[in-house]
Amino acid sequence: RQARDGSFEVQVHGWDWIEGHLSEHADLAVRYGLIAVASPDFHDATTASTIAKQIGSRLATAVELMNDRRSVNERFTLQSISKHLGFPDWRKLEAIIEGRPDVSASELVNVARALGINEQWLLEGKQTPFLVDPEDYRGAAEQFDSIQRLNPRRIVFVRQSEDDFESIVAAEIDHFRWVTFHWDHPTSSHVGGTGKYQLLEYCCLIRRLYRTFDHPGACTLQGKHLERADFMRLWAGDVYPGTFLHWGHNDHWWIDFAELATGRVEGTSDSARELREAIRIARVVLANHQGPSERDGWMRTQLVHAGMPVNEPKSAAHYPLDLGLSRDRIDVDG
C-alpha cells in the first residue's frame, strides 16, 4: 500500500511463494524496494536464502540416510546421483545442497521423484523423508495395478516378526528409487471376518505379482522379516528402504504363504506359529470359494489371476506359484 509520503509498504503473505518467484521478477523486487532479498544482479547472487538452505540441508540429510549401512564402494555419491538425474556434472547438485542456486520448484520435485524422496518433506519439511504410497486400496487387486504401473525391478514382501505380524510391500524401481506401500496386509490369526478374506487376497496378490514379474530379465521377488521398530520406520517413510532391503537373506516366508504350504513352515516361534495359522485360515476360505462357477464371482476372478484352481475335488498340500505355467500342483498325500 502507498503511504502519505509516497513510499510503499509491502505486506507479504505466503512468503514461501514470494521468495520462490522473486528470481523470475527481480526487476519488480528492485522497483518496490525489496532490496533485502533481491538486488539487480539477483540471478548471479551466491547468498543462499533461508528456505533454499533448509531444502539443501534436507536433501543432504536424505543422501546421508540413503548411504546408511552401505559400504564405501556402494555409497551414493553426488557424481552418481547427478548422472542419474541427468545433470551435466555434480556441481549443480552440490549447489542445491548448499542452497546457492535459483532452482525452480519443479526441478526440486523432479529430484525428489527420481530419488524416492517425499516431495512435501523436501520442499516444506513436512511428513517423513521417503516416499510412501498413501493409497487406501479397496482390495489387493487395486494394489497390483499400482505396482504394475511402476514396473519395479525388485519386490520385497516385508513382514513384522512380532506383535501383529503385519506385512507390507516395498518395490525397488531402479538403483536409487524405492516405493513403500502403506497398505498393510494380515499374516497371522489376528483377523476377524473381513481379515480372513484379506489373508487369501494377499496370497493372491503375491501369486499374481510372481506370475507377472518373476522371470529372467524382469523382476526379482523376495521376502524379509523385520523387528517392530524397524518395520514401523519403513512403513512410515523414516528410513530409506534400501537400508533394510538392499542386501540380506531372502526369507522364503512369502513363498510358503503364497503356496498355502502349512507343512513347510518350521519353527516354534510366535512368528512361525502365526504364519502357519494364517495359512490354515486362508485355506479354509479358499475351500469355501472353490465350487460351482456361479458362486462368489469376485473372488473367483482373483483366484484365476493368481493361478489357483477353482474347481477342486479335494485340497492340495500346496499350490505352487507357477501352477499351470510349468508344473502341476502337488496333491495331498493319501
Predicted regions mapped to residue ranges:
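A short, Lys/Arg-rich alpha-helix, primarily the initiator
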Residues: Y32, V37-S80
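Conserved catalytic/binding loops enriched for acidic/polar residues
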Residues: K126
